[in-house]
Amino acid sequence: MSKDLNSSRIKIIKPNDSYIKVDRKKDLTKYELENGKVISTKDRPIASVPAITGKIPSDEEVFDSKTGLPNHSFLREHFFHEGRLSKEQAIKILNMSTVALSKEPNLLKLKAPITICGDIHGQYYDLLKLFEVGGDPAEIDYLFLGDYVDRGAFSFECLIYLYSLKLNNLGRFWMLRGNHECKHLTSYFTFKNEMLHKYDMEVYDACCRSFNVLPLAALMNGQYFCVHGGISPELKSVEDVNKINRFREIPSRGLMCDLLWADPVENYDDARDGSEFDQSEDEFVPNSLRGCSFAFTFKASCKFLKANGLLSIIRAHEAQDAGYRMYKNNKVTGFPSLITMFSAPNYLDTYHNKAAVLKYEENVMNIRQFHMSPHPYWLPDFMDVFTWSLPFVGEKVTSMLVSILNICSEQELDPESEPKAAEETVKARANATKETGTPSDEKASSAILEDETRRKALRNKILAIAKVSRMFSVLREESEKVEYLKTMNAGVLPRGALARGTEGLNETLSTFEKARKEDLINEKLPPSLSEVEQEKIKYYEKILKGAEKKPQL
């Protein structure tokens, strides 16, 4: 065996070989880059990037010892360094916020001066910039119009920091509900995934409970109707808002849905003015863009403002290139009938838009714009670098191994041709041996069979590695489906799901979905013991009644 190894092309590297000895004098604390710059291996290569906080803070740090309220100053810095809270601390802040918010009416009535902000969407580092531009919340009143979570990677940090400011500034800091503050949308977009990555389902449920108690609208200075989405055909008076049962999930239709989902029509500014309104013109049309609620017209806005003695509607809900948009002026008041605010700069890291806040003070309205702030990068779906890169690396490594091992021709690797060719060759050698009786011919025949066996083993290895390569490729390209299958199958990928590539994965997913739907009845909450007893009583009563109705023999 050793002789075969030495005669092969494989070089056995021994530990005492001179060319693999480590230079003991080399300073391993220093590393020279390609450009000649020497850096320390003990320090962070890019010192300008803040280090991540890995420590879970104590309760004394998170909560004020005197008031018991969240320490928003500490949380601000802790979240800035990507720190996390314990599960108990997070739930405590969420429960405190739920209690405080539930005591507020559906329609808030606020006074100026106040700063009004639009969508935040999980952009925590831009939220900190917002407070730099808008002013210290301890000194200035704030009204947020909703959509604190989803899309951005720091939704939880935004929510908890805003809640901590709310709890410390009751009567001065106000938060409305947006259409993303619900289980339906947060499950579809990113917030639920973020919560399961950073915490767990219990913390996510606590967040959703807090969403259900957020107020729906605000009347600012008795002149401005502030809401996340817009107005509704069911909204005749601002007081109609107080008639809504808001302590629930957002419905798919009705006044509550419209307040959070409605948009102005695309040609809002092209409408006629005042008495020139076209009587046949619709005030509300189906909102095809959103798939629910309505799109309201300039005519609808003017009618609502006139009926309630208001100047303007201030809302959020739509990204704006400048961070805000002033719509067509109301001819009666000479003031914009509608204002849209958006406070998430460079939305989704792709829009390149500015953000803005509206500062209203002494009957003067100022709009302050700001640009995005640098923020830590997260991979899609909160993947870690190993989960993200391993399938790619594995695919390339196996591809390289296939290339190295693929030293046989296609004919040699053909499973049908190999045994036949080997058999024919051996038979020919055997016949020749019988005729000549030469021992060397017998050895040659044995060598041919051995070569064919090796070739077959090599072919099987190549096919096995190619199969692994294919599985890595599927893992990389279909990572979302793979993760979903694992989630729905107790964290384990069903056997054979990757073997047949993307097609097989899709079939597995389809089959699994069908089975899951059929089994949904078992996902319901089981009946209580009292309910079981009631069902038994009803069953026995039904049997007795049936027995009484039978004729006596």
Curated annotation (Swiss-Prot):
As cofactor, the record names:
Fe(3+); Zn(2+)
Per the record, what are the reactions this protein catalyses? Answer: O-phospho-L-seryl-[protein] + H2O = L-seryl-[protein] + phosphate; O-phospho-L-threonyl-[protein] + H2O = L-threonyl-[protein] + phosphate
Give one Pfam family, short name only.
Metallophos
Composition-biased stretches (Basic and acidic residues) = 417-427
- Where are residues bearing N-acetylserine located in the sequence? 2
InterPro entries for this protein:
Calcineurin-like_PHP_ApaH (IPR004843), Metallo-depent_PP-like (IPR029052), MPP_PP2B (IPR041751), PP2B (IPR043360), Ser/Thr-sp_prot-phosphatase (IPR006186)
Molecular function (GO) terms for this protein are: calmodulin binding; calmodulin-dependent protein phosphatase activity; metal ion binding
Its family?
Answer: Belongs to the PPP phosphatase family. PP-2B subfamily.
Tell me what this protein is called. Answer: Serine/threonine-protein phosphatase 2B catalytic subunit A1
